[in-house]
Amino acid sequence: MAKSGLRQDPQSTAAATVLKRAVELDSESRYPQALVCYQEGIDLLLQVLKGTKDNTKRCNLREKISKYMDRAENIKKYLDQEKEDGKYHKQIKIEENATGFSYESLFREYLNETVTEVWIEDPYIRHTHQLYNFLRFCEMLIKRPCKVKTIHLLTSLDEGIEQVQQSRGLQEIEESLRSHGVLLEVQYSSSIHDREIRFNNGWMIKIGRGLDYFKKPQSRFSLGYCDFDLRPCHETTVDIFHKKHTKNI
């Protein structure tokens, strides 16, 4: 296992801090997070190398960069194999009142240009604020580099007069998506309980509260009303898996 042993001079302090964290995560077998830190630390070391004139220091830096790159590559191969075997699992715990968990912040890592189809299973896309949550999720998909063409939604049907509002809201979202070249297919189930989101690049995300994990804003003019990275969250758990194939709803 790689060790951070980087000399603490002003130029390399940032790199040393990130790489120290990478080694800690590595030792705890938190490989996805460790890989991110290794990659960031390597980029910082490369910047230090560009500004270093002393040949001895340059040689030492190249050696350290090579060592960290080897470790990062080994972790990447391990994670890729986990994905191939369908064993990959990452868990994120969102604490009560935590911020920084907008849909873009949570999902962007898993949305690349290969994503063309999305499946959402969530029994609670019914009330007005839940319809807005689904709309924000769709907006996020449209803005990402992926080329989503079809969105499948499986949810439960509201009761009474609220059913009209739910159907009308989803119809308006469907029409709006169609104007952007995206097909929305909605199905209803009275027995749905699970909440999960799947992309056709193999990623599957299960959120304990589904899309409805944001708290109500304190007022219409409080921070977080518009920017959901600033919106406090309810406590929930996010489980992320990777499978070679996703199933249809």
Curated annotation (Swiss-Prot):
Entry keyword annotation includes Cell membrane: no
Reported effect, residue 132 to A: Abolishes homodimerization
Record bears the keyword Membrane: yes
Residue ranges constituting the MIT domain according to the UniProt record: 8-86
Region of interest: Important for association with membranes: 168-231
Result of changing residue 168 to E: Strongly reduces binding to membranes
Biological processes annotated in GO: midbody abscission; mitotic cytokinesis; negative regulation of protein binding
Its membrane topology: Peripheral membrane protein
Effect noted on mutating residue 231 to E: Strongly reduces binding to membranes
Broad class of the protein's primary localization: membrane
Subunit record text: Homodimer. Interacts (via MIT domain) with CHMP1A, CHMP1B, CHMP2A and IST1.
Role description: Required for efficient abscission at the end of cytokinesis, together with components of the ESCRT-III complex.
UniProt remark on domains: The C-terminal domain interacts with lipid membranes containing acidic phosphoinositides and is required for location at the midbody. The MIT domain interacts with the MIT-interacting motifs of several components of the ESCRT-III complex.
Name of the protein in its database record: MIT domain-containing protein 1
Species annotation: Homo sapiens (Human)
